Amino acid sequence: MKVAIVTKINCKSCINIARIIISALPSDWDIIYEKSLARAIKKPGLEINEINADIIIVIGGDGTILRTAQFAHGNILGINVGGLGFLSEIEIGNIEASILKLIRNEYTIIEYMGLDVYVNGVYSGKAINDAVIHTDKVSKIRKFRLYENNYFIETTSADGVIVATPIGSTSYSFSAGGPILMPNLNGIVVSYIAPVGFRSRSIVFSEKTDLKIAIVGERSLLTIDGQIEKKLSKNDVVNIRVSENGARFISMYTNFYEKLREKLIKDVVN
């Protein structure tokens, strides 16, 4: 079994957790380390885009997990250090019990849908959570023209537009008033950030949709999973479609609703 360990950059507590995990893993497992962690523990390491493993243990927040999903190859197991950590499966208090489950193969592997993003026909990256087109200046709105399979839908004035996967529908899109999609639904959610007027609501498209968003007016920014950023100019066109390959995550929850209750709706009485 080949296991890679990735930690949030400049996170001392993450390094301490990594040491605990390293000591708990079977001695016959092959462990590789992402370079920033490797430097801290004085081990040989790999750049994140060089990592290819059976399991990738990621210690940090959702940003670290998305960075790993963007560049590394393997089944991702997230350990939450800090924030909400919706993409994580393990909290700090149950690390040892969860690693024991990992060793015993007491988990499932879920593949989350991804989105391929193109700007003017040139591939720009893959989104596991979302692709966001937003204004490049505070308090400035932009116009976005939306098409499905080259059929014009609407032109909307807003601070931005979010195109989310099912797992990404629990993130920025949800905060913007969008619906939550179950991970097995394979739909695409389009939500606007602070739209002008009451008509602009979230739209759910099928996985066969080729979305096109044309930038009307001034410059904007494209952000993919918060990891890749690209400047957009007037009349630039962003195409987004479902990727052939998403990202594989290790799950230790009984079902998605259990995770939803724990991470997003903690006030619900069970």
UniProtKB/Swiss-Prot annotation:
GO terms for molecular function: ATP binding; metal ion binding; NAD+ kinase activity. Its cofactor is a divalent metal cation. This is NAD kinase. Keywords: ATP-binding, Cytoplasm, Kinase, NAD, NADP, Nucleotide-binding, Transferase. It comes from Picrophilus torridus (strain ATCC 700027 / DSM 9790 / JCM 10055 / NBRC 100828 / KAW 2/3). One of its GO terms (biological process) is NADP biosynthetic process. The keyword NADP applies. Its EC number is 2.7.1.23. Belongs to the NAD kinase family. Transmembrane segments: none annotated. GO terms for cellular component: cytoplasm. NAD(+) binds at residues 62-63, 67, 129-130, 140, 159, 167, 170-175, 194, 227.
